């Protein structure tokens, strides 16, 4: 599953139905950046902070992240790049990441420890990597199927 930005109620409701009724695993494929982790992936897993009343109906808490992880950059020699000070959107996302790590209960829940560690790494390293970087890895490489986490 992927999203063009923060997933709508319809996308999240659909993911919830698949998770609950079909009992099949759901994976989210996204970039390794602060915005994706704290807004897109978090909203899919836990629902929208703006609509707390019905989040149980519009979230898929068992969704897994399938994408670039911090350790993948070195392990697979993936192309990543530094967040530049003039990239206003990325700088803003990093500032918000620092805030959500302190104040959002989602990131204090032990079930989301992996996501919290990723956000901490993003804040410390000030780097990002896009999902397309994975396409630089040879698909015949036997280590690629091991990548599912979070």
PLM regions: where:
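TOPRIM fold recognition
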Residues: 9-150
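Metal-dependent catalytic core segments for phosphate chemistry
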Residues: 1-6
């Amino acid at each position: 599953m992927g999203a063009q930005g923060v997933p709508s109620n319809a996308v999240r409701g659909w993911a919830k139905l698949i998770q609950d009724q079909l009992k099949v695993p759901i994976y989210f494929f996204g970039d390794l950046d602060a915005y994706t982790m704290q807004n897109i992936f978090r909203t899919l897993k836990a629902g929208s902070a703006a609509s707390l009343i019905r989040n149980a109906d519009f979230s898929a808490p068992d969704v897994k992240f399938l994408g670039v992880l911090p350790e993948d950059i070195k392990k697979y020699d993936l192309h990543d790049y530094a967040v530049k000070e003039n990239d206003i959107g990325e700088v803003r996302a990093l500032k918000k990441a620092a805030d959500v790590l302190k104040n959002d209960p989602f990131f204090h829940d032990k079930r989301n420890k992996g996501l919290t560690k990723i956000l901490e790494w993003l804040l410390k390293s000030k780097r990002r990597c896009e999902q397309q970087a994975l396409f630089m890895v040879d698909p015949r490489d036997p280590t690629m199927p091991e990548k599912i986490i979070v």
